[in-house]
A protein has these predicted regions:
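Conserved CoA-thioester-binding segment of acyl-CoA-metabolizing enzymes
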Residues: 1-55
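Hydrophobic/aromatic residues within transmembrane alpha-helices
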Residues: 15, 52, 64, 109-111
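Histidine-centered beta-alpha loop that forms part of the nucleotide-sugar donor binding/catalytic region
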Residues: 18, 63, 99, 121-122
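Glycine-rich acyl-CoA binding loop
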Residues: 23, 27, 99, 106
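An acidic, glycine-rich surface segment that forms the CoA-thioester-binding/catalytic face
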Residues: 31-35, 39-43, 65-99, 138-141, ...
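Short active-site-proximal "capping" loops at secondary-structure junctions
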Residues: 55-59, 65-67
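CoA-thioester-processing core
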Residues: 83-91, 97, 103-145
Length: 145
């Protein structure tokens, strides 16, 4: 089963995380499929804008800690992949459609977008801050929100 679904609606590419049973938590496979989707978006001359969302009651709950613990790398995430969305080289707009939780790494994904639209009751949280920890590199973008 694909953890990231893409569909085209004219010049709009919809990128949807599809791991609702884990609140779209960021595991190795989901990260790889997101990277692939955003490379496809970047390279498609017919795509002008992407709408980025998640299936179920969460946009993204952040790092998949269960998978991270099984890998033996708790809290460190997976190895970086070529992802024009995350590395700042994407020159097309991305709109976040936030349908619930955007926590930790999910909040970081929201930070990378150009426009954010959220349902009433959406939850934004940087969990690391509750424990006086430094979050991922993306949290430096908060000032731009």
């Amino acid at each position: 089963m694909a953890l990231v679904e893409t569909e085209y609606r004219g010049q709009v590419m919809v990128v949807r995380m599809n791991r609702p049973d884990r609140l779209n938590a960021l595991g190795v496979q989901l990260r790889a499929e997101l990277a692939q989707a955003f490379v496809e978006f970047r390279d498609n001359p017919d795509s002008e804008v992407a709408v980025f969302t998640g299936t179920g009651r969460a946009f993204c709950a952040g790092e998949d800690m269960k998978e991270s613990l099984e890998r033996g790398t708790p809290g460190r995430g997976a190895q970086p992949l070529e992802n024009p969305f995350m590395d700042g080289t994407l020159d097309k707009p991305v709109i976040a459609a936030i349908n619930g939780f955007a926590m930790g790494g999910g909040f970081m994904l929201v930070e990378r977008t150009d426009l954010r639209v959220a349902v009433r009751g959406a939850v934004f949280e940087i969990s690391e801050a509750k424990r006086w920890l430094l979050g991922g590199y993306g949290h430096g973008l908060i000032a731009g929100l």
